[in-house]
Amino acid sequence: MLRCGGRGLLLGLAVAAAAVMAARLMGWWGPRAGFRLFIPEELSRYRGGPGDPGLYLALLGRVYDVSSGRRHYEPGSHYSGFAGRDASRAFVTGDCSEAGLVDDVSDLSAAEMLTLHNWLSFYEKNYVCVGRVTGRFYGEDGLPTPALTQVEAAITRGLEANKLQLQEKQTFPPCNAEWSSARGSRLWCSQKSGGVSRDWIGVPRKLYKPGAKEPRCVCVRTTGPPSGQMPDNPPHRNRGDLDHPNLAEYTGCPPLAITCSFPL
């Protein structure tokens, strides 16, 4: 749910192949016959007040008729500031001040761009797109500007990165962990640790990632071929992913133990 005043308005990241998403983005943003073009001054009249011609908002330059959600966007409602303008940035930052209700998203991170993508999916599903607003994202000819092309590229990169993260989580699920002042800390693996259901348990290992300050605990498969090994590769050692170069054992924990305890 969108909340003004807090950063990180995530609907949850969509799990999809970047190539499919890129095609979808081009379908949303590419040339389309019959679309109405608004100038910002014209769009500002669509705030849902008495005598206004309608209740519209824009996201990444696309204009949506949000009349069916009037109670959320009409004058006096919590999100009335989004009506009659493109306030793309505020969908991520939650800054609903006049300074925050703007369309500049050039400095947002890849994760924040994915948040915008999810909001765009939400509006495409729940409201009717009635046109485009000229300015940052669309030119007077109705075609995407370089700024919108950059947004599309950032979203595609974010989707690729998200896909890789999900794949890594399947290979190296996070460990379960607990700590108490009486017993110290404990790390352990199960068939559902890290929220990843699987047919193996694994053993705790430290996973070192480039750029990360500290390793994190992951569960590592101990039998079968290494993940990603092709069928025509040389015979494996039946050690699963234990020999992955970015992994390290926990000092004081038996190599094949599914639980590592570290008393105080």
From Swiss-Prot:
Origin superkingdom: Eukaryota
Domain Cytochrome b5 heme-binding: 35-134
GO cellular component, one term: endomembrane system
Coiled coil: none
GO molecular function: heme binding
Membrane-spanning parts: none
UniProt entry keywords in alphabetical sequence: Neurogenesis, Secreted, Signal
Signal peptide (UniProt feature, chain positions): 1-22
Subcellular localization: Secreted
Main localization of the protein described in the UniProt heading: secreted
Any Gene Ontology biological process: positive regulation of neuron differentiation
Classification via Pfam families: Cyt-b5
Annotated family: Belongs to the cytochrome b5 family. MAPR subfamily.
Function in brief: Heme-binding protein which promotes neuronal but not astrocyte differentiation.
Further remark: Non-classical progesterone receptors involved in extranuclear signaling are classified in 2 groups: the class II progestin and adipoQ receptor (PAQR) family (also called mPRs) (PAQR5, PAQR6, PAQR7, PAQR8 and PAQR9) and the b5-like heme/steroid-binding protein family (also called MAPRs) (PGRMC1, PGRMC2, NENF and CYB5D2).
Comment text on domains: The cytochrome b5 heme-binding domain was proven to bind heme, although it lacks the conserved iron-binding His residues at position 73 and 106.
Name the record gives this protein: Neuferricin
Taxonomic source organism: Homo sapiens (Human)
Gene: CYB5D2
